[in-house]
């Protein structure tokens, strides 16, 4: 393959991965999945009923791995057995995966709310009807972009793994990045805005999430709107960089050409990792110097 064509395909893969990362994080924010959902689940037990979609089908990595694997399996069958166009096959695969994910989301949130009836947590059918299409829409975008990435890597770049296996791996990866990157913005900032930033979460405040929004009762739409400003884009950038930089070294220094090029790609990958570690350290040091540690106010100091 010509180097320019390879870099062009790699750029397209990076764009698709960036979109997939952003949509995955916003999907988890609308449905309240992964780590922050433990507080949403705990809120009714602490006498704080809410109108937040409480699905948490599972952790984000296995949830997205299942979603992407289903879409890839359907697309593979349509391409190989029915000779359907790859584009239409990927779209139909993502659509079926979104329907499967939507089914799990509905049964999950209804089951969780019903199990908390003793704590006076209602099952809001209007909330379920309004949020489920949004969750399915985000999951469709995520799955389709992951399928595009996997298909291009398999067919164009000649990756040895089959489409379904690659989609499974990238599904786990995008879920893990969304859980560790974007969910911090939702859980640490959006759920506990009534407490001073940087103060941490006292055990006595567990479950005391923000239940009222800028206008009316807060729901998943509000959380997605807030996280689209920072958490979603950062997740997209993180996943996009992971996919792009991970494939860039082997595209520029193709191991198939010679063994020496293969070792050069390994060295280039290590250098990139070291640069990112140093960059992350500099950002953390700058943030600590700019904002400093959390300081107790006078009333807390007096009581201590």
From Swiss-Prot:
Its EC number is 7.2.1.4. Its main location: membrane. GO terms for molecular function: tetrahydromethanopterin S-methyltransferase activity. It is found in: Cell membrane. It comes from the Archaea. It is a multi-pass membrane protein. Keywords: Cell membrane, Membrane, Methanogenesis, Methyltransferase, One-carbon metabolism, Transferase, Translocase, Transmembrane, Transmembrane helix. One of its GO terms (cellular component) is vesicle membrane. The chain crosses the membrane at residues 3-23, 86-106, 131-151, 152-172, 233-253, 263-283. Pathway: One-carbon metabolism; methanogenesis from CO(2); methyl-coenzyme M from 5,10-methylene-5,6,7,8-tetrahydromethanopterin: step 2/2. Pfam families: MtrE. InterPro entries: MeTrfase_E. One of its GO terms (biological process) is methylation. It catalyses: 5-methyl-5,6,7,8-tetrahydromethanopterin + coenzyme M + 2 Na(+)(in) = 5,6,7,8-tetrahydromethanopterin + methyl-coenzyme M + 2 Na(+)(out). The complex is composed of 8 subunits; MtrA, MtrB, MtrC, MtrD, MtrE, MtrF, MtrG and MtrH. Part of a complex that catalyzes the formation of methyl-coenzyme M and tetrahydromethanopterin from coenzyme M and methyl-tetrahydromethanopterin. This is an energy-conserving, sodium-ion translocating step. Belongs to the MtrE family. This is Tetrahydromethanopterin S-methyltransferase subunit E. It comes from Methanosarcina acetivorans (strain ATCC 35395 / DSM 2834 / JCM 12185 / C2A). The gene is mtrE.
């Amino acid at each position: 393959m010509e180097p320019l064509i390879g870099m062009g395909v790699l750029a397209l893969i990076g764009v698709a991965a960036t979109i997939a990362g952003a949509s995955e994080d916003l999907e988890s924010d609308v449905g309240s999945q992964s780590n922050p959902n433990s507080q949403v689940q705990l809120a009714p037990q602490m006498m704080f009923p809410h109108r937040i979609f409480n699905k948490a089908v599972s952790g984000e990595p296995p949830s997205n791995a299942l979603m992407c694997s289903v879409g890839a399996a359907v697309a593979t069958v349509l391409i190989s057995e029915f000779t359907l166009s790859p584009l239409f096959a990927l779209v139909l695969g993502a659509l079926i995966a979104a329907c499967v994910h939507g089914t799990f989301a509905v049964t999950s949130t209804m089951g969780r709310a019903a199990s908390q009836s003793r704590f006076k947590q209602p099952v809001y059918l209007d909330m379920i009807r309004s949020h489920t299409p949004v969750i399915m829409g985000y999951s469709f975008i995520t799955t389709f972009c992951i399928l595009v990435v996997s298909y291009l890597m398999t067919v164009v770049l000649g990756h040895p793994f089959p489409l379904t296996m690659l989609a499974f791996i990238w599904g786990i990866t995008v879920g893990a990045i969304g859980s560790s990157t974007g969910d911090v913005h939702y859980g640490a900032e959006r759920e506990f805005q009534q407490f001073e930033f940087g103060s941490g979460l006292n055990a006595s405040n567990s479950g005391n999430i923000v239940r009222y929004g800028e206008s009316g009762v807060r729901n998943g739409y509000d959380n997605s709107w807030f996280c689209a400003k920072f958490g979603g884009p950062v997740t997209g950038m993180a996943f996009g960089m992971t996919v792009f930089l991970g494939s860039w070294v082997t595209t520029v220094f193709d191991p198939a050409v010679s063994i020496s090029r293969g070792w050069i790609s390994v060295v280039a990958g290590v250098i990139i990792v070291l640069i990112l570690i140093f960059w992350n350290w500099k950002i953390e040091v700058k943030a600590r110097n700019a904002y400093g540690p959390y300081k107790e106010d006078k009333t807390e100091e007096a009581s201590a």
